[in-house]
């Protein structure tokens, strides 16, 4: 069954109701989130119901703290792809507006989950809070489930080898510290930036290493610098490469973007959507005294990146 995206919760058709659904923000869909979705999947199988994920767009933080720097770990499109790969049937995108924010926990359950979505089962994380003032708790959700005739399961916390709890915040912290490997450990896959390839100054092409340039818009900004990468093309191919994340101080750029040199690749990608995984942090961004010195360093970056993402080539 192909993933269906449902916007909103009012006046839904019968086929969009009656799911066993995981409830949460699920930014990044990390391994802790995956445990919540697995709980919903068990219920969906037992109830012979569609497997759903209930989340919010925009993220609640965007409504309450509109001036806060970008923090998202994935776009809705990326989230939908990951969830589809996990077997999710329906992704409910609930508009998080002032009406939604005004609902008490009881109103949210009764008006949105029961009347709107007609849920048969809700799975949530051990630390879930919902409703105005974040008054809803796992215990409250269980009580509301009993009162309204839907099942509830609460996923236990998922911890790593060091006993740390998996969270979206820990992923963001790892990325800001230049530790994409740690971010990937928590996510269960590499962190990736997706966007439309835009034209740059063409300097890289003139110097022999053309780059695919993508602006960083709503994503959390990882530590600026150079990364070994893998890029997924629109046709599904994956190409190793090396990328500069930053504003290129040598050439005086001011916008933060990801400029990726795809190894052994010379096709036109302008206007196309690509997704670039950050595999390993190689070095901070540097300002060079000359273009020649910059080229020498890029060649060293290439050798280091190839050893990581394209060994033997």
Which positions does each model-derived feature cover?
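N-terminal catalytic cores of NTP/NDP-binding nucleotidyl/phosphoryl-transfer enzymes
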Residues: 12-75
């Amino acid at each position: 069954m192909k993933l269906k995206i449902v916007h909103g919760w009012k006046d839904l058709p019968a086929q969009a109701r009656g799911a066993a659904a995981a409830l949460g923000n699920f930014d990044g869909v990390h391994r802790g989130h995956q445990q919540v979705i697995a709980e919903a999947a068990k219920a969906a199988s037992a109830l012979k119901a569609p497997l759903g994920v209930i989340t919010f767009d925009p993220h609640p933080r965007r409504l309450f703290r509109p001036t806060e720097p970008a923090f998202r770990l994935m776009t809705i499109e990326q989230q939908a792809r990951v969830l589809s790969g996990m077997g999710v049937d329906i992704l409910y995108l609930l508009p998080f507006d002032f009406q939604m924010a005004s609902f008490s926990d009881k109103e949210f359950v009764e008006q949105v989950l029961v009347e709107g979505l007609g849920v048969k089962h809700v799975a949530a994380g051990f630390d879930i809070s919902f409703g105005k003032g974040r008054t809803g708790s796992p215990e409250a959700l269980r009580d509301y489930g009993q009162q309204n005739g839907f099942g509830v399961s609460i996923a236990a916390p998922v911890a790593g080898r060091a006993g740390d709890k998996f969270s979206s915040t820990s992923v963001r912290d790892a990325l800001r510290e230049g530790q994409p490997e740690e971010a990937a450990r928590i996510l269960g896959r590499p962190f990736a930036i997706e966007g439309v390839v835009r034209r740059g100054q063409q300097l890289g092409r003139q110097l022999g290493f053309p780059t695919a340039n993508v602006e960083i818009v709503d994503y959390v900004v990882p530590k600026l610098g150079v990364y070994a990468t893998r890029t997924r093309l629109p046709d599904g191919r994956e190409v190793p490469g090396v990328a500069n994340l930053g504003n290129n101080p040598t050439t005086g750029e001011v916008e933060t973007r990801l400029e990726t040199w795809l190894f052994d690749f010379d096709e036109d990608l302008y206007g196309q959507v690509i997704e670039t995984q950050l595999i390993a942090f190689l070095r901070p961004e540097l300002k060079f005294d000359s273009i020649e010195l910059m080229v020498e360093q890029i060649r060293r970056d290439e050798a280091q990146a190839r050893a990581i993402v394209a060994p033997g080539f």
